[in-house]
């Protein structure tokens, strides 16, 4: 399983739309009101014999929702689901809401050995 697949598997039971990097929509298509995107930076971890045996990913999951909607249960469900994964740490939650909508960033570390992601 890739790290992308693992993140999507954890998030989609709570927020059904979850994509890496950016949610793209076609011309005239209305994006969902609630969705998640995610991104991460990768660092070598568990270095020995001139090789990295693990990867540490600094992950950000972005949760978007309409303004003035109660999102506390969803945010805590996301936090708890992420924390329940053995390779993931308990995330912090940063409020990045602006006038266009609610935006919460769940930041955590993921440490493991994942399959490579095909970016083509």
Where are each of the predicted segments found?
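Short beta-strand and beta-hairpin "edge-sheet" elements
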Residues: 77-91, 96
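Broad gene-expression machinery/nucleic-acid interaction feature
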Residues: 33-35, 58-60, 103-105
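Small/polar-rich, solvent-exposed N-terminal microdomains that initiate assembly or binding
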Residues: 1-49, 69, 74
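Short, charged interaction patches at domain edges and termini
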Residues: 1-10, 41-56, 90-120
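Mid-chain, well-packed structural core segment of small domains
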Residues: 55-83
């Amino acid at each position: 399983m890739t790290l992308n697949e693992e993140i999507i598997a954890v998030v989609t039971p709570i927020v059904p739309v979850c994509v890496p990097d950016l949610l793209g929509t076609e011309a005239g298509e209305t994006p969902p009101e609630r969705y998640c995107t995610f991104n991460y930076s990768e660092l070598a971890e568990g270095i020995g014999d001139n090789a990295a045996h693990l990867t540490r990913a600094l992950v950000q999951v972005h949760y978007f929702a309409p303004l003035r909607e109660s999102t506390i249960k969803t945010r805590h469900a996301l936090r708890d689901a992420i924390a329940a994964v053995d390779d993931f740490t308990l995330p912090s939650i940063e409020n990045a809401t602006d006038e266009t909508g609610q935006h919460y960033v769940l930041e955590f570390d993921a440490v493991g050995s994942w399959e490579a992601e095909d970016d083509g």
